[in-house]
């Protein structure tokens, strides 16, 4: 793949290139390329489904009902070791730019311009990370500039649709608007990474006179205010309307169906809530389950549309979540905190498996063998080159290095790009309450081994993931050679990509580098 780095990259020039590219595309070539749907769920844990991604069913799999995830898995391939970042913004910025979070430095969640969102510390000075997010154009401080794969799709003849959560850039920055990323249609996407409410009775976060009462108010759904339609359903209906229009165009489409579900608040989706109460779940857990099934219904509605419109055989569907399930805030879930993603340890915000391992499925008729599982690992930035390769785009230019590696060989069964490959995460931030693997740490996964390093204490933990999926047995003392080797590799990667680390306020000295 030829990815030349450009010295500068202007959005205006992209528009011109896009027009020329579309003129060159013949209708015959366009029709041969698949439609692509990336169905991204917010804060969905590895166990938040009736589809078992582990080797055995858990009580969570028994409690939840996601028949359309099961339906999709029958048509495609389940990935049991698909990784994202531990926080939404980091994942979505890696997705859209193909850069690892150590490189783009959007390591915590973003919202307001020029404002970091970290919880303050009396002893630790956090790095000046990119809290304004990512952008395709220069000129905004604390912003990573990268080339959008969606823009490349658009240049090469794809009709591009965004529906739901964006969370690429802070308020009043170029990156907050999905149309600045190559999306021709934007439905309800803006800077916020959450939502005020799923309820139309509250106008999704707006007062009666139409003013948002929260920065998390969902824009663009005014037609649904007061209708009794849950936000997940409203977004689905709008996505289907956009697909109805797209079908009239003589070009393939890319739909980024990026649900706000199942992010807090855990509002009750009354289409499903009573059923879970009858199943014996508590009020909180039944509400959480209703969010999950509402999301699953959306997936089924899109699959039904594809079948009804004779597009199912020519459409790739990728199902993914942006980080682990919420497990650190007792106000929204019942049960002991940090356990809601078991057998995985911890949850959202953590570099343990519960915070970064995601439920992922890929369906591609004629390419991916139906009803199969892949136990090889991959990471979110790999979606960038893979989706472009799916679209037949292999020769392109970017302003930033692409850290992702195509997982097409895994889809086709022709190779294993994960063998001997290191995956890296960096979180020199303080997200929320402390917990297992949460705050001020970095990590590397290579083959069966995973090292977690804590900046503040210098502690190193080593886990054999295939043998210890719950990360309960730290074997660092038993394998000092592996700890040393992974520490060096992680340290070298952080230096090479500009990975940041905190400092001590008292001395001004940087916290100990992992390889020091």
PLM feature spans:
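Active-site segment of extracytoplasmic enzymes that catalyze sulfate/phosphate-ester chemistry
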Residues: 21, 38-39, 46-147, 152, ...
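Long, internal low-complexity/basic segments
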Residues: 22-34, 41, 46, 78, ...
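A short beta-strand-to-alpha-helix junction
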Residues: 32, 60-66, 83-87, 118, ...
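Short, solvent-exposed turn/loop segments enriched in Gly/Ser/Thr/Pro and often Arg
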Residues: 53, 78-99, 107-114, 162-174, ...
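Formylglycine-dependent
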Residues: 111-159, 166-251, 259-268, 282, ...
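Histidine-centered active-site microenvironments of extracellular/periplasmic hydrolases
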Residues: 174-182, 264-270, 304-367, 379
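C-terminal cap/loop subdomain of S1 sulfatases and analogous C-terminal strand-loop tails that border
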Residues: 185, 190-193, 325-353, 368-376, ...
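A long, amphipathic alpha-helix that forms part
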Residues: 230-247, 274-315, 332
């Amino acid at each position: 793949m030829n990815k030349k780095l450009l010295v500068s990259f202007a959005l205006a020039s992209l528009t011109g290139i896009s027009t020329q590219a579309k003129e060159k595309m013949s209708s015959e070539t366009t029709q041969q390329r698949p439609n692509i749907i990336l169905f991204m769920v917010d804060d969905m844990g590895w166990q938040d489904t009736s589809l078992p991604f582990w080797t055995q069913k858990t009580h969570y799999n028994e409690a939840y009902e996601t028949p359309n995830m099961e339906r999709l898995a029958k048509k495609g391939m389940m990935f049991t070791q698909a990784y994202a970042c531990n926080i939404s913004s980091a994942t979505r910025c890696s997705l859209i730019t193909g850069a690892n979070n150590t490189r783009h430095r959007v390591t915590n969640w973003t919202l307001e311009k020029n404002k970091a969102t970290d919880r303050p510390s009396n002893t630790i000075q956090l790095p000046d990370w990119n809290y304004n997010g990512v952008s395709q154009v220069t000129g905004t401080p604390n912003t990573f500039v990268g080339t959008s794969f969606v823009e490349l799709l658009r240049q090469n003849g794809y009709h591009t649709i965004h529906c739901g959560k964006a969370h690429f850039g802070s308020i009043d920055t170029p990156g907050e608007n999905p149309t600045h990323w190559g999306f021709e249609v934007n439905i309800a996407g803006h800077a916020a990474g959450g939502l005020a409410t799923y309820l139309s009775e509250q106008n999704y976060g707006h007062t009666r006179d139409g003013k948002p009462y929260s920065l998390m108010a969902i824009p663009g759904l005014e037609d649904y205010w007061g209708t009794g339609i849950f936000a997940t359903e409203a977004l689905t209906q709008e996505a289907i309307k956009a697909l109805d229009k797209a079908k009239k165009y003589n070009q393939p489409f890319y739909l980024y169906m990026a649900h706000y579900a199942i992010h807090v608040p855990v509002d009750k989706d009354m289409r499903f809530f009573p059923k879970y109460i009858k199943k014996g779940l508590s009020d909180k857990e039944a509400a959480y389950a209703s969010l999950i099934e509402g999301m699953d219904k959306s997936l089924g509605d899109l699959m039904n549309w594809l079948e009804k419109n004779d597009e199912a055989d020519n459409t790739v569907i990728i199902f993914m979540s942006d980080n682990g399930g919420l497990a650190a805030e007792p106000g929204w879930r019942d049960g002991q905190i940090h356990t809601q993603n078991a057998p995985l340890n911890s949850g959202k915000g953590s570099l343990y498996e519960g915070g970064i391992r995601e439920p992922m499925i890929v369906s591609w008729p004629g390419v991916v063998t139906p009803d199969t599982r892949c136990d090889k690992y991959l990471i979110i930035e790999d979606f960038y080159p893979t989706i472009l390769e799916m679209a037949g785009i292999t020769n392109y230019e970017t302003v930033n290095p692409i850290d992702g590696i195509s997982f097409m060989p895994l889809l086709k069964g022709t190779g294993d790009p994960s063998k001997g490959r290191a995956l890296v995460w960096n979180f020199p931030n303080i997200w929320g309450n402390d917990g297992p693997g949460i705050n001020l740490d970095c990590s590397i996964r290579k083959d069966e081994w995973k090292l977690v390093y804590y900046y503040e204490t210098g502690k190193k933990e080593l886990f054999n993931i295939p043998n210890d999926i719950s990360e309960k047995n730290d074997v660092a003392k038993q394998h000092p050679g592996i700890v040393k080797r992974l520490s060096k590799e992680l340290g070298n990667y952080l230096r090479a990509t500009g990975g940041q680390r905190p400092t001590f306020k008292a001395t001004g000295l940087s916290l100990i580098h992992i390889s020091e």
